[in-house]
């Protein structure tokens, strides 16, 4: 051998702690929140994360001499304190692009959040953010259609899309399920959806559901003269079954299908997104299982990372929480990952949880979906927070109306249009929310009843995962 080989164990920081390194534009950058075991220096723990998520192992190995370790290794180039947390710190790591397969989110996550999360030198580890370089983004398919194309397909402009999840989400026969879809769509909603856990159960097989839903959508379109749709969940036991369901939705001339991207997996999701792009189908994405991964403030993966990965893997709509509803998520954090779903460039902004500038180039945007514990009183705040390029989904806030789902849908439609009209007239819709809604209710008995029904319903719990800012 031309180089000397010294067997044994050496400290990670000797190789992977490089504070003088200046990241390249082509590097994939990651920010981890690290909590090491007591007595282990920060630099050693951070370097261990860089090593174990790239080229390193616990021992010096002779085969390192067969490659260019200096070229391929991950480098921890910066360490920062976490505001208000004396135990943890931020480790910023740069990875050369050649470590990752082109267009493969699966491969990126296998490296960054693989075995390193079980490393004994760590008490906790959380992936807070990723900066994907443009050279990698250009290898990803991204959203199969994007916001502009979706609006054209649905012929909906100048306001958020309005939808709901069918309830009860489990237990209905296919025919009764279709009846509920019809009631919601004829009442004024643009879209209805399968819940994340409705696939093909004994009480309702998928083909039966698809057929009755297609009939309901077409009847509602004929009655209202509007384009309607329903998110048909194609998540299945195998990829082959998933594609079979997608093909049948296409045969029924349905405009949009759905996938549970975390439980279904990024490989399946990317494949389905590619199919949708080729077949002119919109793709709605549910984030079931996300909170298992992202809710602990010191361990796991932040949802902003999962949202970025979804935009690259492919989806036209993604659930993001509501801020005001029953699900976890504060306003600034939510706005931070909504920006990364929709904008072409997102600057670093710690007040929104964004640790890096992120350039998305010409990649299409993704509709942010607000769903979970929302009702008509939330409409002004939802419009102010999410803006027009969003989908507002009221499940219980539609079906729980005393007069039924059609009346609940009508109430939500009137409330939305009243808020959009008030905003366009220059009114401060959050401050004037009560006046705006009460004025609209004078001409809508459905809205008046909805306002009375849900006037005391609030979800005022403190956020578990807060931004690390002072």
Curated annotation (Swiss-Prot):
Q: What is its main location?
A: other
**Localization of this protein:** Carboxysome
Entry EC number(s): 4.1.1.39
Sites binding Mg(2+) sit at 193, 195-196
- Active-site residues per Swiss-Prot or TrEMBL entry: 167, 286
What does the record give as cofactor?
Answer: Mg(2+)
Asked if the record carries the keyword Acyltransferase, the reply is no
Record-level GO cellular component terms: carboxysome
Q: Does the keyword Ubl conjugation apply?
A: no
Q: Which residues bind substrate?
A: 115, 165, 169, 287, 319, 371
Task: Give the keywords, sorted.
Answer: Bacterial microcompartment, Calvin cycle, Carbon dioxide fixation, Carboxysome, Lyase, Magnesium, Metal-binding, Monooxygenase, Oxidoreductase, Photorespiration, Photosynthesis
InterPro entries given in the database record: RuBisCO, RuBisCO_lsu_C, RuBisCO_lsu_C_sf, RuBisCO_lsu_fd_N, RuBisCO_lsu_N_sf, RuBisCO_lsuI
Report the catalytic activity. Answer: 2 (2R)-3-phosphoglycerate + 2 H(+) = D-ribulose 1,5-bisphosphate + CO2 + H2O; D-ribulose 1,5-bisphosphate + O2 = 2-phosphoglycolate + (2R)-3-phosphoglycerate + 2 H(+)
The record ties this protein, via Pfam families, to: RuBisCO_large, RuBisCO_large_N
For this chain's record, the cofactor binding note is: Binds 1 Mg(2+) ion per subunit.
**GO biological process, alphabetically ordered:** photorespiration; reductive pentose-phosphate cycle
UniProt-annotated site: Transition state stabilizer, residues: 326
State the disulfide connectivity. none
Q: One GO MF term, please? A: ribulose-bisphosphate carboxylase activity
Q: What class of enzyme is it?
A: lyase
Residues where N6-carboxylysine is found: 193
Name the family: Belongs to the RuBisCO large chain family. Type I subfamily.
The record makes one more remark, namely: The basic functional RuBisCO is composed of a large chain homodimer in a 'head-to-tail' conformation. In form I RuBisCO this homodimer is arranged in a barrel-like tetramer with the small subunits forming a tetrameric 'cap' on each end of the 'barrel'.
Query: Subunit structure of this entry?
Result: Heterohexadecamer of 8 large chains and 8 small chains.
Q: What does this protein do?
A: RuBisCO catalyzes two reactions: the carboxylation of D-ribulose 1,5-bisphosphate, the primary event in carbon dioxide fixation, as well as the oxidative fragmentation of the pentose substrate in the photorespiration process. Both reactions occur simultaneously and in competition at the same active site.
In its UniProt entry, what is this protein called?
Ribulose bisphosphate carboxylase large chain
**Gene for this protein?**
cbbL
